[in-house]
Structure formats: structure tokens, C-alpha cells
A protein has these predicted regions:
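Surface-exposed, low-hydrophobicity interaction/linker segments
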Residues: 40-103
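Intrinsically disordered, low-complexity Ser/Thr/Pro-rich tracts
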Residues: 1-59, 169-197
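Solvent-exposed coil/turn segments that connect beta secondary-structure elements
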Residues: 76-78, 116-118, 144, 154-157
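Helix-rich interaction surfaces within compact, conserved domain-sized segments
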Residues: 126-129, 133-197
Length: 197
């Protein structure tokens, strides 16, 4: 049996270690998400529809243009479309917010939960609790809402009769952070509200 000098053993261990790290890095890199080309659309509706949530309506969003003009949206409340250059900060509001600002937040990945202004306080408290530790949730009253609660995201909407419906949390889990500008902030932005009358 031939023994190698200690210096050779150390060099071999170092080479094996580097080789292992290189191999591990290659394996990890292969498991990572693919790198997107600059300008690629990172919002993939197919991912959002992988396991359908009963009652979710999906929409093809025609435009994401910025405008300072009021927008008439095909859905009420809106689920994407042209929007104000300023996004609404994701938070819980006691008064309605401008849809054009909320839609910009949806583009960043926000789920906008709207509710009837006369929703009981106990139900509003449940909605407020949902917003804890969820940076992509925007909650506000919405005058004229046809359902007690509606959750809207970019290209998707869920109408609900009850804030405790488990589909609401499933919708948030599915769509929060999944907008065309995924990764854009929602914890800053405008905080203005509008008058109901």
C-alpha cells in the first residue's frame, strides 16, 4: 500500500471538495426556476389555474396601460386593466379606494378584497385578520357591491356570501403575489380614499 504525503492528501481533499461544490451548484442550479429573458411576462395564468378553486371567474386582461383618466372596467369590482400610474398601498381601509389605484396594486400581485359597506363589524374583523402578515392584501368597502364580499386579483375574481368561506383563503394563497409585475412592492403607495357620495 502506498501512502501519499500529507500535502497531496490535502490537495486531493480540496479538489474533491471543490468538485463536490461545483457538482452541488450544478444540481441546485438545475432545480432552480429558469432565468427569464429581459421583458418576459412572468405572470402565468396557467399556474393560477392548476387546481381550480370552485367559483373563481377568470378574465383575459386586454391592457395594463397607465392612465390618469377614470376607467370603466368590464368587471365590477375590476380584476385588472388600465390603471393609474400610482398604486394603492396594500392595507385595510375603512373607506372606498379608487379602483384605478387598486388595479395597479393588482398588477403588483395584490388581492383586493372588497366588501359591502354595511358588512357586520365581526366580519370586517375577520378580513382584517387575514391581512396580518400578508403583504399583498388590499381590503376596502365597495359601495354598490352585489355580493357581501368579492376577492379580485389580476384576471380573476371570487364572489362570496361569507367571509369565513374557505375558498377566500385559498384564493389569497393562489393569487397573492401572482400578478404581471410579480415581486413589485405593495407595502408602499398611495393611501388615499374616496368619498362615497
Amino acid at each position: 500500500m502506498t501512502l501519499l504525503p500529507k500535502t497531496h492528501v490535502g490537495a486531493m481533499c480540496a479538489a474533491l471538495g471543490i468538485g463536490f461544490l461545483t457538482l452541488s451548484g450544478s444540481i441546485l442550479a438545475q432545480d432552480a426556476s429558469p432565468t427569464l429573458e429581459p421583458g418576459a411576462d412572468i405572470f402565468d395564468p396557467a399556474v393560477a389555474e392548476a387546481t381550480p378553486i370552485p367559483g373563481v371567474e377568470t378574465f383575459e386582461v386586454e391592457s395594463a396601460a397607465h392612465t390618469t383618466d377614470p376607467v370603466e372596467y368590464p368587471q365590477d369590482p375590476p380584476a385588472g386593466g388600465p390603471h393609474d400610474p400610482s398604486w394603492q398601498r396594500c392595507a385595510v381601509y375603512d373607506a372606498p379606494v379608487r379602483p384605478e389605484n387598486a388595479v395597479h396594486a393588482q398588477e403588483h400581485g395584490a388581492v383586493w378584497i372588497t366588501y359591502e359597506p354595511d358588512l357586520p363589524e365581526s366580519d370586517r374583523e375577520i378580513l382584517t385578520q387575514l391581512a396580518e402578515n400578508q403583504p399583498y392584501l388590499l381590503i376596502s368597502p365597495y359601495p354598490g357591491l352585489e355580493d357581501p364580499v368579492v376577492a379580485s386579483a389580476w384576471g380573476a375574481r371570487l364572489r362570496l356570501d361569507d367571509v369565513s368561506d374557505p375558498r377566500l383563503t385559498a384564493f389569497i394563497d393562489r393569487y397573492a403575489g401572482n400578478g404581471p409585475e410579480r415581486g413589485a412592492t405593495c407595502d408602499t403607495g398611495v393611501e388615499t380614499t374616496i368619498d362615497e357620495g
